[in-house]
Amino acid sequence: MRPSGRRADELRPISIQRQFTKHAEGSVLIGFGDTRVLCTASVEARVPPWLRGQGRGWVTAEYGMLPRSTHTRSDREAARGKQQGRTVEIQRLIGRSLRAAVDLQALGERSVVVDCDVLQADGGTRTAAITGAFVALTDALEGLVRQRALPASPLHGQVASVSVGVYRGEPVLDLDYAEDGEAETDMNVVMNDAGAFIELQGTAEGHAFRRDELDRMLALAEKGVGELLQHQQEALAT
C-alpha cells in the first residue's frame, strides 16, 4: 500500500494554472499533488555569443527552490555563493527537454529563458517543472505569433515528464516525498507526444533493479506521461 493510498499506476492530482503572473510572456503554476512549481517563460531578443549570426534561437532554463519549500529552511544558493550540483543538473535537464520540442532555426535569433521556482516540494519537482515549463513555453511562443514576430509557432510537439520507481518491491508511478525517501529505485522519464523517450535518469538506491522491473516502470511512465500530455492540452485549450 502506498502512503497516499494511490494505485501503483495512479498520478497525484494534477493542476495547471496559466497566466499566473502578469509580466512574463508565459507563466504557469503547476501542481503535482502537494508539489508546486512556478514556471515563467521570458523572451529575449538575443542569443548566447556562440550562436550569434547563425540565424538560430535558443531555449534554456533555470531552476531553484524557495528556502522554505521543504520541511526545514535551506539557505538561498545566492547566499552560499554558488549553485549546488543538483540545481545545475536539473536546470540542464529542463533545458534539454524543452529544446527537444522546438525548431530552433524557426525560432530565429532570440532566446526563451524558462525559470522554474519550486514553491513547495513533495517529490517530483523536476518532472513537474518540465511539464509546467512546456506550457509556459507554448504561451510565450504563441505570443510571438500573435505579435507577428513569427509566422508560426516553432513547436513541433509536446513534452512532459514523470517519475517512476520501485517502492517496497512494487513499481509505482509519480513518487511523492514519502515514497522517494524509501524507494529502492528512482527514475525520471521525459517523453514527447509521439511516445518517444527524450531522457531517462534512473538509479538503484536500495538494490539493483531487474529488466522486468525496468520494463514495468517504463510502461508506467508511458501511461503517466500520456495523462500529463492530456492535462497540458486541456490547460492550453482554456
UniProtKB/Swiss-Prot annotation:
The reaction(s) this protein catalyses: tRNA(n+1) + phosphate = tRNA(n) + a ribonucleoside 5'-diphosphate
InterPro entries: ExoRNase_PH_dom1, ExoRNase_PH_dom2, ExoRNase_PH_dom2_sf, PNPase/RNase_PH_dom_sf, Ribosomal_Su5_D2-typ_SF, RNase_PH, RNase_PH_bac-type, RNase_PH_CS
Protein name, as recorded: Ribonuclease PH
EC number of the protein: 2.7.7.56
Encoding gene per record: rph
Lineage, top ranks: Bacteria, Pseudomonadati, Pseudomonadota, Gammaproteobacteria, Chromatiales
Subunit record text: Homohexameric ring arranged as a trimer of dimers.
GO MF assignments: 3'-5'-RNA exonuclease activity; tRNA binding; tRNA nucleotidyltransferase activity
Keyword Transferase: yes
Keywords: Nucleotidyltransferase, RNA-binding, rRNA processing, Transferase, tRNA processing, tRNA-binding
KW Transmembrane (keyword) present: no
